[in-house]
Amino acid sequence: MRDQIKILITNQKGGVGKSTISANLAGFIAIEKNHKVSLIDFDKQGTSSSLVSKNSHPNIQSYKSGLVYQQNSGITMLEAKAALRRYSAHADITIADLTWTFGLPYEFMHEFDVLIVPSSNSKVEIASTEIFILEYVQQQLMKLRHKKQMILVAPSRVDRNQLKDVKFSGLEILENYSICPPIYRISQINNEVLNDFWFRVDNGIISENMKEFGDFVYEKITELKNRKLALTAELQNRIPVNSTRPNQPVITRSDYLSKEQVKPAPESQTQQEFSFIPPFLRKK
C-alpha cells in the first residue's frame, strides 16, 4: 500500500481490550501482511507500546506519546496532531491507541481513515458505544460529508455462546459502519499476549480468532484504499489536463458524493429516531 492509512482505536473507558487489540492488530498487519506499521500509544499507561516492544519486529515501530489534557485548551489537539504527523511519516499503516476524553475535540478523529471502537457485549456498554459514535457523527456532519471515514465496532471479550447477543442496532443506519468478528473471552488469552502476538501463539483458538479479526480489518483497509484511489482517478479524469484558465471551475468531492445520495423512502421507527443523520452517511 503506497497510500498511508491511519487507524484510531479508541473508546471512552478502559477494560475492553483496546490496547491489546491495538498491539495485536499492529503485529498482524506488519508480519502477516508485510507492511510497515507505526503504533502510536497516546495512553499514559503505555500498554500497547510495551506489548509491541516485547514482541519486536523490523516492520513495526512503536512510540509512546502520552497526552497532557488541559481543559478548554487547543494545546492537546496540536500536540496530538504533531505526534501523529511525525510518527506516521514513514509507515504504510499507522495505528493510534487512545482512550477518548472530551479534553480532546472530535476534530482529531478526522485525522484518521478508520475508527475502531472496541466494546463488550453488555447492554450498558453497547448503549454507551452507540451514543459515543452517534454523538461524533451528529456533531461532525459537515466534515464527514467530505471524508469517507470507516467506522468499525470490535466486540471484545465475548463468550462464544453469546455471539447472537452481539448487536449494535442503533448504528446500522450508518453507511460506512461495520461490526468486526468478535474477540473471544478465553481464559489463557491475557497470558499469551505476553508471549507473542495472538495470531502466532500455539493456542489454536486464540490464533485463529485473531487471524479472523485481522483479516476482516485488513479487508476493510484494502477496500478503503481502493475507494480512495478510484476517487483520485475520477477527479483527475474530470479536470482538463491542458487547462490553464484562471477561472476554471474547481471540482470538489461533494460533486461526486452528492451523486450517491438516495431518494427518500418512507421512514421506519429507527430512521425517525436517527433522522438527524443525512442520506450521504446512511447505509444504502
Residue ranges with predicted function:
Residues 1-10:
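Extreme N-terminal, non-catalytic leader segments
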Residues 10-12, 16, 25, 31-95, ...:
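P-loop/Walker-type NTP enzyme "switch/lid" segment
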Residues 105-123:
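Inter-motif core of Ras-like GTPase G domains
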Residues 129-145:
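Conserved C-terminal guanine-recognition region of P-loop GTPase G domains, centered on the G4
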Residues 157-202:
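Beta-strand-loop-alpha "switch" segments that mediate conformational coupling across diverse proteins
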Residues 202-228:
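Histidine-centered active-site loop/cap adjacent to the catalytic His
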Residues 252-284:
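Long, low-complexity, intrinsically disordered segments
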